[in-house]
C-alpha cells in the first residue's frame, strides 16, 4: 500500500518531529527550486547543494593524497580539510616553536580542557582509560546497542584490555593484543563483513600522522608545561605510561583516536543503519574521553571528527569498495533480523544536545560570522546511503543541508563543508523542508 502527499515549502525552517522518517521523499527536480528563508532571502535549492571545491580539490576525489610525501594543505587533502586551524595557529619548524594567532580561541580551547579534566569522575577516568587502550574498532561496537553482543559473538570480536584497570597501570603500559598485531574480529566469521568494512575504511588513506606532523599543535599537557603560561592540566594517572618521551613526533591536532573511532562508527552505521544515531553518539563519547584523559584538546578532537568524516565518505564512494559495502549491509541486516531488537530513542533529545555540544565545544569568537550558507561536500550523501535508501542522492544532500550546524565555530568552516555536517541529526531525517516535497509512503518499507 502507498500514499502520496505534498509538504509545502511554507514549512521551511520548521524542525521535524522526533522519529519522523520520510519514506521515498521526492523533491521536484524540474526547473529551479526556490525557497524563502525567515529573513526573506530567496534560495535556489538546487544550487545550494552544489559542492564547493577546496584548494586541494574535492576530498572524495583526492583522498589518497594523504601520504607522508605531501605535507601542505594544497597537496594533502587531510591537511587541507583541517586548514582553518591556520587562523588560530601557525606551525613552527619545531614541535614547540609555532605562533598563536588567535589567542582568544587558543586560550578558550585550553580552558575547556582544564574544566573537563578538573571535574572528571572515577567512572569517566575508567572510560577514558579503556577508550585509550582498546582498539577503537572494538570500542565502537558498544554503539550497536542491543545488537552488540551478538555481533561480537558472531564476528569473534576481542580485546585484551579488561573492564578493570590494573593496579600497576600507573607504571606499566598495557597494549591491546588485538590491535595492530592481531585481528580485533574475524572477517570470515558470522557478521565478518561488517568487520571487513571497518578495516577497509580505516585502511583507506586514513592516517592522521601527516596532519599531526604539519600542524605541530601541542597536546594540552605540553601547553601546560610551556613557561607556566597556560592552564595546568594533567593526564589521568593510569595513562601516564602512554606519554611519549619525544614530543617532536607527538602532535595533538588532529586526534588519532577520535579519527579511528569515527571511521569505525561510520562503517558500522553504514552496515547497521538502525543504530546510526547511537553509533555517532558513541564516537563522540570516545572523542570526549580523549579530553577527559588529558591527552587531547577540544580542537584536536574536533579535527579528528572532521577528517574522519571526509575519509569515510571517500572510501564509501570508492568503486573498489562496492562489494565489501554490499556484503557488510547484508550482514548488518542479518544481525538485525537475528536479534530482533529495537533502537532506543528514549533519550533522543538529550543525546542530540550532547552530540551537538561535542561537535563544537562552543568554541566561537564573539564576532564570528554565523550567517554563512550551509555547504554540502561532494560525495557526502553516501554517508546516508543505507540510512535512507529510498532517497535519491540529491535528496540525501538536502538532508545534510538542512541538518548542518551554523557557521562561525572554530576550525569548522572548511571550504567543502565537512566540519558542519551533523550526522546524528542527519540520520534522523530532514531538519527542515526547504522546498515543496512529495512524500510517497510505502508500507512495505516501514
Regions found by a protein language model. Give the residues of each.
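Hydrophobic alpha-helical bundle signature of multipass membrane enzymes
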Residues: 29-292, 337, 354-446
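Extended charged low-complexity segments that act as oligomerization/scaffolding linkers
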Residues: 328-343
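A conserved mid-domain beta-alpha-beta active-site/ligand-binding segment of alpha/beta enzyme cores
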Residues: 344-351, 355-357
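Sec-dependent signal peptide cleavage junction
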Residues: 13-30
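Sec-dependent N-terminal signal peptides
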Residues: 1-12
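Alpha-helical transmembrane segments that form the membrane-embedded catalytic/substrate-binding core
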Residues: 257-261, 292-321
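Active-site- or binding-pocket-proximal scaffold segments within functional domains
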Residues: 325
Amino acid at each position: 500500500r502507498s500514499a502520496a502527499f505534498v509538504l509545502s515549502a511554507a514549512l521551511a525552517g520548521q524542525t521535524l518531529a522526533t522519529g519522523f522518517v520520510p519514506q521515498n521523499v521526492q523533491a521536484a527536480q524540474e526547473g529551479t527550486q526556490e525557497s524563502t528563508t525567515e529573513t526573506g532571502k530567496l534560495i535556489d535549492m538546487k544550487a545550494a547543494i552544489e559542492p564547493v571545491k577546496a584548494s586541494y580539490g574535492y576530498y572524495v576525489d583526492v583522498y589518497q593524497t594523504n601520504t607522508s610525501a605531501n605535507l601542505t594543505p594544497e597537496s594533502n587533502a587531510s591537511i587541507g580539510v583541517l586548514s582553518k586551524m591556520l587562523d588560530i595557529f601557525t606551525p613552527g619548524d619545531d614541535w614547540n616553536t609555532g605562533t598563536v594567532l588567535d589567542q582568544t580561541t587558543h586560550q578558550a580551547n585550553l580552558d575547556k580542557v582544564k574544566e573537563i579534566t578538573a571535574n572528571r569522575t572515577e567512572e569517566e577516568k575508567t572510560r577514558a582509560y579503556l577508550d585509550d587502550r582498546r582498539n577503537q574498532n572494538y570500542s565502537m561496537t558498544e554503539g550497536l546497542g542491543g545488537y552488540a553482543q551478538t555481533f561480537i559473538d558472531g564476528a569473534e570480536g576481542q580485546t585484551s584490555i579488561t573492564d578493570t584497570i590494573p593496579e600497576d597501570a600507573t607504571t606499566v603500559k598495557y597494549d591491546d593484543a588485538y590491535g595492530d598485531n592481531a585481528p580485533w574480529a574475524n572477517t570470515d566469521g558470522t557478521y565478518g563483513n561488517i568487520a571487513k568494512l571497518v578495516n577497509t575504511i580505516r585502511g583507506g588513506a586514513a592516517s592522521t600522522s601527516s596532519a599531526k606532523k604539519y600542524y605541530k599543535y601541542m597536546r594540552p599537557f605540553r601547553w601546560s608545561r610551556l613557561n607556566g603560561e597556560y592552564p595546568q592540566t594533567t593526564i589521568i594517572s593510569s595513562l601516564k605510561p602512554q606519554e611519549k618521551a619525544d614530543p617532536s613526533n607527538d602532535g595533538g591536532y588532529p586526534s588519532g583516536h577520535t579519527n579511528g573511532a569515527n571511521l569505525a562508527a561510520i562503517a558500522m552505521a553504514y552496515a547497521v543503519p538502525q543504530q546510526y544515531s547511537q553509533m555517532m553518539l558513541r564516537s563522540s563519547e570516545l572523542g570526549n574521553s580523549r579530553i577527559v584523559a588529558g591527552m587531547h584538546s577540544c580542537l584536536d578532537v574536533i579535527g579528528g571528527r572532521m577528517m574522519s568524516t571526509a575519509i569515510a565518505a571517500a572510501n564509501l564512494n570508492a568503486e573498489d569498495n562496492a562489494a565489501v559495502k554490499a556484503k557488510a549491509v547484508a550482514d548488518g541486516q542479518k544481525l538485525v533480523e537475528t536479534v530482533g531488537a529495537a533502537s532506543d530513542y528514549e533519550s533522543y533529545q538529550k543525546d542530540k544536545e550532547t552530540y551537538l555540544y561535542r561537535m563544537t565545544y562552543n568554541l566561537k569568537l564573539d564576532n564570528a560570522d554565523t550567517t554563512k550558507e550551509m555547504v554540502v561536500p561532494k560525495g557526502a550523501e553516501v554517508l546516508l546511503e543505507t540510512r535512507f535508501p529510498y532517497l535519491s542522492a540529491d535528496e540525501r544532500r538536502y538532508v545534510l543541508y538542512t541538518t548542518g550546524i551554523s557557521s562561525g565555530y572554530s576550525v569548522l568552516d572548511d571550504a567543502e563543508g565537512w566540519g558542519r555536517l551533523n550526522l546524528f541529526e542527519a540520520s534522523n531525517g530532514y531538519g527542515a523542508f526547504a522546498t515543496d516535497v512529495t512524500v510517497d509512503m510505502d508500507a512495505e518499507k516501514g
